[in-house]
Regions:
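Small-residue-enriched alpha-helical segments and adjacent helix-cap loops
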Residues: 2, 6, 26, 41, ...
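N-terminal glycine-rich anion-binding loops that anchor highly charged ligand groups
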Residues: 89-105, 133-136
């Protein structure tokens, strides 16, 4: 174990929280396939940010409760950022009193760049911003083709959007708007390319995103 790993383990063990028992979820870690439960547990047990430890702990607690009762406890609502009529999937917990750290767990859908081409710097920026304001759970990419940033409070939804918008990313894919825009890498990879795919992508995104922007 590296020095950094030891520091993270020591730090996370000092976080004052009672880990929820999750015998049913534990079963999902068995078998040959990667488990999303293992990923959430890793954030709960190993992340250096106490807010994320607690948030993912209560997320696991609520999910175990759902498995026990065979009922979902997420309800919708209205959450948005200034000037937008979509891009956010609101999630409020009906059992927030029992699991207060995850009682608000909204998802932000963010438009991917043309060709799904990311620099390592942009990925680090997104990850750092999400660790600052969200749960640390990210999906590349959701069913709509967007980046899914899963698990934010209502207040931090605005803060996270403001930060990523400053370095060029925009919302999309949820609500009364076009789900996403996709394009191939184009001339950067294909000998048969005969248009500027990235420019076409950009023009279409700008056109349809206007439908989502609100004064």
């Amino acid at each position: 174990m590296s020095v950094k790993e030891e520091e993270i383990k020591k730090f996370s063990s000092s976080v004052k929280m009672t880990r929820h028992d999750t015998p049913m979820l534990d079963e999902l870690e068995n078998g040959p396939w990667p488990s999303f439960i293992s990923g959430i547990k890793s954030l709960r047990d190993n992340h250096h940010e106490p807010r994320i430890n607690k948030m993912t702990n209560d997320l696991l607690g609520q999910l175990e409760h759902s498995y026990e009762t065979r009922k979902g406890y997420w309800k919708g609502g209205t959450v948005s950022v200034y000037g937008y009529g979509g891009g956010i999937i609101p999630r409020f917990s009906e059992v927030g009193d029992a699991f207060p750290e995850s009682k608000e767990f909204h998802t932000l859908r963010v438009q991917p760049p043309a060709g799904n081409y990311y620099t390592t710097d942009s990925l680090r920026q997104l990850a750092d911003s999400w660790e600052k304001y969200g749960s640390g759970l990210v999906t590349f990419h959701g069913q709509t083709g967007n980046i899914m940033f899963i698990g934010s409070t209502t207040e931090n939804t605005q803060h996270f959007f403001d930060e990523i918008n400053d370095y060029g990313f925009d919302l999309g894919g949820a609500g009364p708007c076009v789900r996403t825009a996709m394009s191939c890498v184009g001339a950067g990879r294909c000998e048969m390319s005969n248009i500027n795919e990235q420019k076409a992508h950009r023009l279409l995104v700008n056109n349809f995103m206007d439908d989502m922007h609100r004064p």
